[in-house]
């Protein structure tokens, strides 16, 4: 470890952080809930050319299409109305009495209740409703194809939309809408064969999440786009505000990093110029396995982790997507009520993706800036609860494929986040593979980690 452990995290848990320890299910052939029996997509089985590629109908991939975070906040500044409702916090909800009076409803004599509120720039919006002490929690997301299998692309898109609710510990979604753009560059045969598969994948993932797709919007566009809106009405005790991290908490991550690297490397198999830059550090078979692992991880719902956030008293969380683990950590740190900062020591990464990132000179994976799509939850947990969370999430009662690693600590600070100079890379082996005989320097294989 290149830097000394911060004070206040506790000796026992810091030992786990320093060792790069975590929890994951044993390597095996199970594909996880919803993926058993999966067969790789073959275009020719649908009567399409073997060279047909879903990713050929867009110029960007997945959550890599996001506007840079600083630019985004500037663009959205005009939407913020602090006089009505603070962007984050637990302030009084202004205007509720006036709205009730206008509607002819009785107004209580006592002061307005205090409701949790979230607004622009965060994972989900939390809007207090006028009746019954309930809140509307809503999120929307969409992106472009990043895998070739249209069914799995639909699942990934739905999982990504729901993940913003899961980041708040919400496990139930009342309704989903689907947003779909069909490429004008597709011939009619392609549209008729591919589009239903994307829709089915989205619908199946929604059903796995206990919700349903009841509408949406479908348009023609040069690029394929898929995403949606997730909505739930709930009581304040059903969600966890992302603002209560305390000194001594530890950071837990529930999916490995490297999805964007994996899907790009998979496309480079057919691009000699790109492939020549990485072929000395990875084999074609390793790229195929990493791509499949990335696809299954992206399509896995964060619902189990969301439920366990309540069980183990999580203080805050976010999901890791287009801004990378560092960008989302920084955004989460800014929302904290206490004067804390996040320090990341360990980076669980799909095996060989760190080497590809270095060899290609792209992505910024070890710097934490590489985009992820439908990534895991980064959760602030009490020190004494983190190990139990990691152990519980891999229980067979939740299905195969769930993982978690302790990746950092919460220390006293000024609401910032950083990755240490030489983070420990945890090589996460694709399911169905055996542990490597020798892990690279400054890394550890994770087939059977212990706490």
Curated annotation (Swiss-Prot):
Alphabetically ordered keywords of this record: Acetylation, ATP-binding, Kinase, Magnesium, Metal-binding, Nucleotide-binding, Phosphoprotein, Selenium, Selenocysteine, Transferase, Ubl conjugation
Coiled-coil intervals, chain numbering: none
Entry keyword annotation includes Membrane: no
Residues found modified as N-acetylalanine: 2
Family matches, as CDD domains: SelD
Site (Important for catalytic activity): 66
Modification note: Truncated SEPHS2 proteins produced by failed UGA/Sec decoding are ubiquitinated by the CRL2(KLHDC3) complex, which recognizes the glycine (Gly) at the C-terminus of truncated SEPHS2 proteins.
Cited InterPro entries: PurM-like_C_dom, PurM-like_C_sf, PurM-like_N, PurM-like_N_sf, SPS/SelD
Catalytic machinery residues: 63
Catalytic activity: hydrogenselenide + ATP + H2O = selenophosphate + AMP + phosphate + 2 H(+)
One term under GO cellular component: cytoplasm
Cofactor binding note from Swiss-Prot or TrEMBL: Binds 1 Mg(2+) ion per subunit.
Binding residues for ATP: 66, 121-123, 141, 164, 215-218
GO molecular function, one term: metal ion binding
Modified residues (Phosphoserine): 49
Keyword Nucleotidyltransferase on entry: no
EC numbers on record: 2.7.9.3
Entry cofactors: Mg(2+)
Chain's role: Synthesizes selenophosphate from selenide and ATP.
Subunit structure: Homodimer.
Protein family per UniProt: Belongs to the selenophosphate synthase 1 family. Class I subfamily.
Protein known as: Selenide, water dikinase 2
UniProt gene name: SEPHS2
């Amino acid at each position: 470890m290149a830097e000394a452990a911060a004070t206040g995290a506790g000796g026992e848990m810091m030992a786990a952080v320093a060792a790069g320890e975590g929890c994951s299910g044993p390597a095996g052939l199970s594909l996880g809930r919803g993926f058993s029996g999966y067969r790789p997509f073959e275009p020719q089985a649908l009567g399409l050319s073997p060279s047909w590629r879903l990713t050929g109908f867009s110029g960007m991939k997945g959550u890599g299409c996001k506007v840079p975070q600083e630019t985004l906040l500037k663009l959205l500044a005009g939407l913020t109305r602090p006089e009505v409702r603070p962007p984050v916090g637990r302030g009084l909800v202004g205007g509720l009495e006036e709205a009730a009076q206008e509607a002819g409803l009785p107004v209580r004599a006592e002061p307005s209740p205090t409701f949790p509120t979230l607004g622009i720039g965060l994972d989900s919006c939390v809007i207090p409703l006028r009746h019954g002490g309930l809140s509307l929690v809503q999120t929307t997301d969409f992106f472009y194809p990043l895998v070739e299998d249209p069914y799995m692309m639909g699942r990934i898109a739905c999982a990504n939309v729901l993940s913003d609710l899961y980041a708040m510990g919400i496990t139930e979604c009342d309704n989903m809408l689907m947003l779909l753009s069909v490429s004008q560059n597709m011939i009619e045969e392609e549209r008729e064969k591919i589009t239903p598969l994307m829709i089915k994948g989205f619908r199946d993932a929604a059903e796995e999440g206990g919700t349903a797709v009841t509408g949406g919007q479908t348009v023609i566009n040069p690029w394929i786009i898929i995403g949606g809106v997730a909505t739930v009405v709930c009581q304040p005790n059903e969600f966890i505000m992302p603002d209560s991290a305390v000194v001594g908490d530890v950071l837990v991550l529930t999916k490995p990093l490297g999805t964007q690297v994996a899907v790009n490397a998979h496309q480079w198999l057919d691009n000699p110029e790109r492939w020549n830059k990485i072929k000395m550090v990875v084999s074609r078979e390793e790229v195929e396995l990493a791509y499949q692992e990335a696809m299954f991880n992206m399509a896995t719902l964060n619902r189990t982790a969301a439920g366990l956030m309540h069980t183990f008293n999580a203080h805050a969380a976010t999901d890791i997507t287009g801004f990378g683990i560092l960008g989302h950590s920084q955004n989460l740190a800014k929302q904290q009520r206490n004067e804390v900062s996040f320090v990341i020591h360990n980076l669980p990464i799909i095996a060989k993706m760190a080497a590809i990132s270095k060899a290609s000179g792209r992505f910024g994976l070890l710097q934490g800036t590489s985009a992820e799509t439908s990534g895991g939850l980064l959760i602030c947990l009490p020190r004494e609860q983190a190990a139990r969370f990691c152990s519980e999430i891999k229980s067979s009662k939740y299905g195969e494929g769930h993982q978690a690693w302790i990746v950092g600590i919460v220390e006293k600070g000024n609401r910032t986040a950083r990755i240490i100079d030489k983070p420990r890379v945890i090589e996460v082996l694709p399911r169905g593979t055996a542990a490597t005989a020798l892990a690279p320097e400054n890394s550890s294989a994770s087939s059977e980690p212990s706490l």
